[in-house]
UniProtKB/Swiss-Prot annotation:
Annotated source species: Candida glabrata (strain ATCC 2001 / BCRC 20586 / JCM 3761 / NBRC 0622 / NRRL Y-65 / CBS 138) (Yeast)
Gene from which the chain derives: GLN1
Record's subcellular location: Cytoplasm
Top-level taxonomic group: Eukaryota
GO CC annotations, alphabetized: cytoplasm
Limits of the GS beta-grasp domain: 24-103
Protein name: Glutamine synthetase
EC number(s) reported in the record: 6.3.1.2
Organismal lineage: Eukaryota, Fungi, Dikarya, Ascomycota, Saccharomycotina
Keywords, in A-Z order: ATP-binding, Cytoplasm, Ligase, Nucleotide-binding
Length: 372
């Protein structure tokens, strides 16, 4: 790690301790037109206690691949806010949806459509837990701590590894964990993954739209923490060719009927419904996913649907304790690490709980790829 790439946090600290004279800083965060995050800050005159107190804002969408230059204003509508783990105090981080100048959702705003489904199926109490895998790179786009011009020893000792040479950058991971807890993200765990310098964190259980909200914010906090250490975060599903594991976003799902004794019947019904919409789901399950879903490295084939108990090579896995108890949840192992969680949770709700008249998650993919 090169010193010039690391933020001077110790110098910054004395300024962070200065009083703000009654002002609050709100960092607005949004999803841009490339599947990445952007943010900018503004000063507010009072402590924020409800989402309604936050003003709408705007930005230049032509600089984020979200609008043409001749009509570039994109509007930010706050939908959730969290304590800011970097500025602390009364300062907040705000998640915002993007809308065009005519009031329609921007084509990269998939939260709006997904939320219609969650509102319509509120009584189902659909819960999600997402396992976010990612890979660390240095400032020169080499996998973090890998030998220069070479490769580490083959996979084997790295998954949940302990000790030098088996795990790398634990300080980044621990800092991110604490930042999420401080901000109120329902982060439920972390672990080192199968490939060296690949890690995972889990968020959930979260109900409905809050799953996407919290995962996007957890990603934002990860990027911000990694900035300070001079580390890049990659969510590419297959960052390295060869005999190395890819990166996924395994998505665990349950409805209230699945979580009570006798729930296995509803789990099996959901899997049957999912089997009939495999291709529609795959379209929304992340770019470059075909590089990962090969049937090797603990993945299913991209071209066929399968399910099984404790089978990490299946599209849908039923955990063994769930099969034994007869109720609980199932795991969709198909989503890639770079998913938009609103697309994945939205189409999952649509398939499992039922379509509604004014929402169509499959069209979200077409809207993003075809709309000018």
């Amino acid at each position: 790690m090169h010193e010039h790439s690391v933020e001077k946090t110790q110098i910054l600290q004395k300024y962070l301790e200065l009083p703000q004279n009654g002002k609050v800083i709100a960092e607005y965060v949004w999803v841009d037109g490339t599947g990445n995050l952007r943010s900018k800050a503004r000063t507010l005159n009072k402590v924020i206690t409800s989402i309604e107190q936050l003003p709408e804002w705007n930005f230049d969408g032509s600089s984020t691949n979200q609008a043409p230059g001749y009509d570039s204003d994109i509007y930010l509508k706050p939908v959730a806010f969290y304590p800011d783990p970097f500025r602390r105090g009364d300062n907040i981080t705000v998640l915002a949806e993007c809308f065009n100048s005519d009031g329609t959702p921007n084509k990269f705003n998939h939260r709006h459509e997904a939320n219609k489904l969650f509102q319509a199926h509120k009584d189902e109490e659909i819960w999600f837990g997402i396992e976010q895998e990612y890979t660390l790179f240095d400032m020169y786009d080499n996998v973090y701590a890998w030998p220069k011009g070479g490769y580490p020893a083959p996979q084997g000792p790295y998954y949940c590894g302990v000790g030098a040479g088996k795990v790398y950058a634990r300080d980044v991971i621990e800092a991110h964990y604490r930042a999420c807890l401080y901000a109120g993200i329902n982060i439920s765990g972390i672990n080192a993954e199968v490939m060296p310098s690949q890690w995972e964190f889990q968020v959930g259980p979260c109900e409905g739209i809050s799953m996407g909200d919290q995962l996007w914010m957890a990603r934002y906090f990860l990027h911000r923490v990694a900035e300070e250490f001079g580390v890049k975060i990659s969510f590419h599903p297959k960052p390295l060719k060869g005999d190395w594991n890819g990166a996924g976003c395994h998505t665990n799902v349950s409805t209230k009927d699945m979580r009570v004794p006798g729930g296995m019947k509803y789990i099996e019904q959901a899997i049957e419904k999912l089997s009939k919409r495999h291709n529609e789901h795959i379209k929304l399950y992340g770019a470059d996913n075909e590089q990962r879903l090969t049937g090797r490295h603990e993945t299913a084939s991209m071209t066929s649907f399968s399910s099984g108990v404790a089978n990490r090579g299946a599209s849908i896995r039923i955990p063994r304790p769930v099969a034994k108890e007869g109720f609980g949840y199932f795991e969709d192992r198909r989503p890639a690490s770079n998913i938009d969680p609103y697309l994945v949770t939205g189409i999952m709700c649509e398939t499992v709980c039922g379509a509604i008249e004014n929402a169509n998650m499959s069209k979200e993919y077409e809207r993003e790829t075809n709309e000018q």
